[in-house]
Amino acid sequence: MTYEGAIGIDLGTTYSCVGVWQNERVEIIANDQGNRTTPSYVAFVNNEVLVGDAAKSHAARGSNGVIFDAKRLIGRKFSDSVVQSDMKHWPFKVEEGEKGGAVMRVEHLGEGMLLQPEQISARVLAYLKSCAESYLGKQVAKAVVTVPAYFNDSQRQATKDAGTIAGLEVLRIINEPTAAAIAYGLDKADEGKERNVLVFDFGGGTFDVSIISVSGGVFEVKATNGDTHLGGEDVDAALLEHALADIRNRYGIEQGSLSQKMLSKLRSRCEEVKRVLSHSTVGEIALDGLLPDGEEYVLKLTRARLEELCTKIFARCLSVVQRALKDASMKVEDIEDVVLVGGSSRIPAVQAQLRELFRGKQLCSSVHPDEAVAYGAAWQAHVLSGGYGESSRTAGIVLLDVVPLSIGVEVDDGKFDVIIRRNTTIPYLATKEYSTVDDNQSEVEIQVFEGERPLTRHNHRLGSFVLDGITPAKHGEPTITVTFSVDADGILTVTAAEELGSVTKTLVVENSERLTSEEVQKMIEVAQKFALTDATALARMEATERLTQWFDRLEAVMETVPQPYSEKLQKRIAFLPHGKEWVGTQLHTYTDAASIEAKVAKIERLAKRALKSARREGKDGWAPGNEDNGSGDDNDGDDNSDEEDELQRGRGVTEGSGRSPIRKRDRIEAINANTE
């Protein structure tokens, strides 16, 4: 018999947890060892495949064939600097796969095997699935799985793939801090009072901070920030480096002379002492067999020393908190509760720094740090599998998450046109209209970027596709509709269509080119740092574009004017060589956007007056009501004449991929629709 509902799984870097909604509450399910959390370890030993506690026990003994940290590899390229750095600390081998991804080599049943991170994660998911089946007495087919808030599209899709491999239909990918907020707020959903909650999710391998507004049954994410490569394992690594330095200094033993088995044992001892120092001020690392004379190696550690070794790690945590507050436009006093999630949030130094930042506020301990994420996932699983309305505790609850970075397309001259802005609530759908830059253009390249800078060359390219079959027409006339849709899993789909040609193309952005959280934050910081210079660069680019259009149009009309020109026309066009010279030799010296705009506006006024005079004297003739009013100004009521519209349509072609890009339609507003 198959269970009609769904389970919730917190697939962690170091530990995982599974829960299910039963009897009006979430039940956290213990594994076959009686533990409510399961190590995210898989061991290929003695012709067996072990998962969880049994696998980790082999790691502690230094056995070969034990794989862990799959979450730090999933969705990443082998060439990723993060992967290259982590490889130095892993006892297992990591190689480059066929498509450039990171794969792990193991020996099993006498054969060498290359395993994808998804396959390792699938083993953990399958084990948790079996634990749930033992608890429920039924087969389980559906689940909600959590990921760090800053996981990119590739990592999210890879996690869904792992669920599929494990025999699960993944109903939803949900962000870990959002799931934890549900665990915190489920009992407060009927209070009605709006509360701003900061979720501090410091796990084994990832770190997220989300600021969530809880009001009645609505959980709305206001901002999220994080680091997908920061967690308790970084503390373990710092302790390991300290121990290796001590061994080298006291005994002259270099790391290279230690076996992988001994390094694995030492790493396990470092993790153990880290846990001890969370509730004791003194601990020690003790290990037999390391020293040549058989003497036991002992290194005493104090909590103060651990805090000293990890100063930079803890500082990184606080900086993420401060960035999240800034993104949410909130101050520390706007936060009612700080919810601690993840085993690493137990570290006393971390809690002390948080209390100091939030001016002595009592940190929330009403949710279990190790179980909160699975708790929220189980609630979401209950709702998505049809349980909505069956429980008075879940009826009326709405979950609203956000995108971490602005996404958009490149338009002519390499400008970044944002379609969905950072921290926009998802699921979300936005549509904008664009057009062509050349006459009879039959195709356009849609290039998709994410970032916070106004020029695409400073942002990160996600992918591109060509929309062909466009109806031949004058440039600016075809209507190209571009739609961005971010689903509830945070995965982006881009669709472009041209109505007359009845052509449509779609791109699902689920590749490994999406940014890591570190790259995202760096881009935000750089955008803030260079905001002024970016504005100036954009102003220069637009000034050149606008004035060149006026100059070209004026010269084209002048060719239709019989010579000699009238005295008035000669005076009107006298600015032209000076205007061209300013664009070519002086514009680049201007250092602020306001002064550029003032100069451009002045030249545009002169160009417009000259163009009107030239039209009157040219082959186009003149029309009643369009005469010069004789005062030398332009107050003749035709400031919105056809020539300006023609100039707006006459955007130039840019350099780039060799394909013509799209251009923005200035008069057409974005059409945004929040999809429920």
UniProtKB/Swiss-Prot annotation:
UniProt cross-references to InterPro entries, sorted A to Z: ATPase_NBD (IPR043129), Heat_shock_70_CS (IPR018181), HSP70_peptide-bd_sf (IPR029047), Hsp_70_fam (IPR013126)
Family statement drawn from the similarity comment of this UniProt entry: Belongs to the heat shock protein 70 family.
Entries under CDD domains matching the protein: ASKHA_NBD_HSP70_HSPA1-like
Organism annotation: Trypanosoma brucei brucei
SUPFAM superfamilies registered for this protein in UniProt: Actin-like ATPase domain, Heat shock protein 70kD (HSP70), peptide-binding domain
Stored PANTHER family: HEAT SHOCK PROTEIN 70KDA
Molecular function GO labels: ATP binding; ATP-dependent protein folding chaperone
A GO-annotated cellular component: nucleoplasm
Keywords: ATP-binding, Nucleotide-binding, Stress response
Biased composition (Acidic residues): 630-646
Protein name: Heat shock cognate HSP70 protein
Region spans: Disordered: 613-676
